[in-house]
């Protein structure tokens, strides 16, 4: 479940900048969807 979030974080850490905030929101929403589905 959380593996996808960690993979996204790895890519996120590689590219620093404004993408961090965008990806953080995206990961949070993605985790929420995964929790709701499972």
UniProtKB/Swiss-Prot annotation:
Protein name: Uncharacterized protein HI_0114
Lineage of the organism: Bacteria, Pseudomonadati, Pseudomonadota, Gammaproteobacteria, Pasteurellales
The organism's place on the tree of life at top rank: Bacteria
């Amino acid at each position: 479940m959380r593996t996808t979030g960690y993979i996204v974080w790895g890519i996120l850490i590689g590219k620093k900048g404004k993408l961090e905030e965008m990806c953080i929101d995206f990961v949070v929403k993605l985790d929420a969807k995964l929790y709701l589905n499972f």
